[in-house]
Amino acid sequence: MSSGGAGEYNEDRHLLRSTDGDEVGIGGGEGDLDVESQSPAIRSGAGGVRDLFKHIDRRFSLSGRRLSFKRMENIRVDRERHNPSSSSAFSAAGEEDGGGISNLHSVDDRNDEYGFDEEVLGDSAPPEWALLLIGCLIGVAAGICVAGFNKGVHVIHEWAWAGTPNEGAAWLRLQRLADTWHRILLIPVTGGVIVGMMHGLLEILDQIRQSNSSQRQGLDFLAGIYPVIKAIQAAVTLGTGCSLGPEGPSVDIGKSCANGFALMMENNRERRIALTAAGAASGIASGFNAAVAGCFFAIETVLRPLRAENSPPFTTAMIILASVISSTVSNALLGTQSAFTVPSYDLKSAAELPLYLILGMLCGAVSVVFSRLVTWFTKSFDFIKDKFGLPAIVCPALGGLGAGIIALKYPGILYWGFTNVEEILHTGKSASAPGIWLLAQLAAAKVVATALCKGSGLVGGLYAPSLMIGAAVGAVFGGSAAEIINRAIPGNAAVAQPQAYALVGMAATLASMCSVPLTSVLLLFELTKDYRILLPLMGAVGLAIWVPSVANQGKESDSSEGRSTGRGYSSLSPSERKTEGVWRHTDNADSLELTVIENPDHNSFLDEETILEDLKVMRVMSKNYVKVSSGTTLREARNILKESHQNCIMVVDDDDFLAGILTHGDIRRYLSNNASTILDENTCPVSSVCTKKISYRGQERGLLTCYPDATVGVAKELMEARGVKQLPVVKRGEVIHKGKRRKLLGLLHYDSIWTFLRDEMSRRRSINDRRKDKEVGTNGH
């Protein structure tokens, strides 16, 4: 930590540590680290917009700057190219101080020595007020794009099903099959063919992009074309009636808007997560006209799986602003009506609560069947492609054909907006509404058709199908329960109408299928605006979430360690967790909305950067360090250093709080500057010699520390940027305001990071190999 080696010592140009003031350590949350000198960026600009953000940042940004791995490597290479001899001397001098505890110069010294301009090194993310403004812009952009997407779906639907009334499925069910079979069968197949052809186009664009990756400068226009094509695929899928929903694509549109703004700036991982969360919230808010549910959706699918404590403190404000603005824009363009009309219903008594709990478990069981069907269909289509050598574009056509065949018997499985859901919600109140027995068949058919469409590669979401399946299951359960109880107790009217159970079933199925319990509860509450439904709703949702976790517990135990985020809780693809790429083409086209189906990309969790971003400092730090009290003499400290073979000693005060750090370099500088005698060593306390504070850019700051819940990637970048090899780990939150002291927990060694990284990569590679062997044995090919 202290610098070593010979030469004149300048206290203002050494040992960048900071724990004082508002800049106490790293790890997000309270007291984010100050990394004012940590963002050298040797990257090409991407046009006037990015330059504007950079200019704003240089003038106003005071915090939140990080150094990426690739930038550090670029700077190191450029330094060696500019002055190889100085670089070698610099490294040698750094090793002189007891095993290379730190380098001789601070970052500012290196900038001067190697000719780096401070304006270049100041390049980083915009300030908080600018990001809040960007959150508003994301809301506007997402609202406009989602409205355009919905208009496109309606245009395609009206053209494909011309002459069919708005009630669609109910009308088709009442017609003679001989008059309608060709349309029911051929229209979804046509949609599948178009989607499959566009899959082929995406593969061509992916190959072009990879071939030009080495020559790419500035903005990647192919990356902007990709989400547009995906939105068109989703519009065609839904417009031709295939059994999926529009909310997943709406969320993807919001995420794409956020990615577009993120690519215009130099952003760290946490700010990308914040922008993605704002995009996800705006997508679901504009899709459902439910701003509150959009906020909770972002929290559940983005912030929760990616450690919300590492996100910037203004993330929640960004999410709320984006959600409200996108919902407002969507209202202005599409109207203020809700996604579907909630019928009148009545909750009879609290004695029905056990029935709602049973319904929750039933919905959970349905979601388990559905998720396994999706996996089975996906693997089946992959097997067919490999076995018969079929191109990937054929699979969506087969999915459309399967949906059409099912629709010949049950036309209610076709996507027709939310008219099918409204028809179910009016069971018993409308002559055209299906009966209980037909609803049971329709629920089963919808599960199979949706899993088939999703597994075949058709593009769409699961929210709308989940709501329809849940409504059907709830209506069947409520109607059956009422009939059984009325037969057992004649004249008893203590059971609510099927509409109440249908509403609760919708939320429970949605929560279980997509792992969004809070979003489901808030969404239904926003739609019904009835507080009475919350108690049965929350009970049913809780059990609906519990059933899949129990059912999948055995299956996940073998593979959970092989996935960096765990089952079903991440809204970001592995490639998006890195600081570099956000454009990735995958065959299964999972959207943000689909959180329960496992992402098949297992290569990213073996990536060095991904592992470092997933690991916490507490797993790598060492608790085997030497500490002495501040009253220990310098002679005693020197003997302890020699006997313990340590490079540094942690100095603590009488209350065992971190007071400073003592290195061989500190001792040599004290002895040379003070011409001290043996008597001085025997009487001088280490508190007078150790490093306690540093002056950096005209400000006096304390020791540089980190928190145990910080990511190893952030700590590594900080150590590289500040030229230190050890970093004290202190307890978060226990700040003694008088002196701002911290409780010492451990010591993070730079060399230990690489040792742990090698071991972790080996462990994950072994898990991945076992998983692949198991899959081969299961699939039989």
Swiss-Prot record:
Residues of the CBS domain: 621-677, 699-763
Membrane topology: Multi-pass membrane protein
Compartment(s) of residence: Membrane
GO CC annotation terms, alphabetical: chloride channel complex; chloroplast; Golgi apparatus
Residues annotated as transmembrane: 129-149, 184-204, 221-241, 250-270, 279-299, 314-334, 350-370, 388-408, 433-453, 457-477, 502-522, 523-543, 726-746
Main localization of the protein described in the UniProt heading: membrane
Location of region: Disordered: 1-41, 79-98, 553-584
Protein name: Chloride channel protein CLC-f
UniProt source species: Arabidopsis thaliana (Mouse-ear cress)
Gene that this sequence comes from: CLC-F
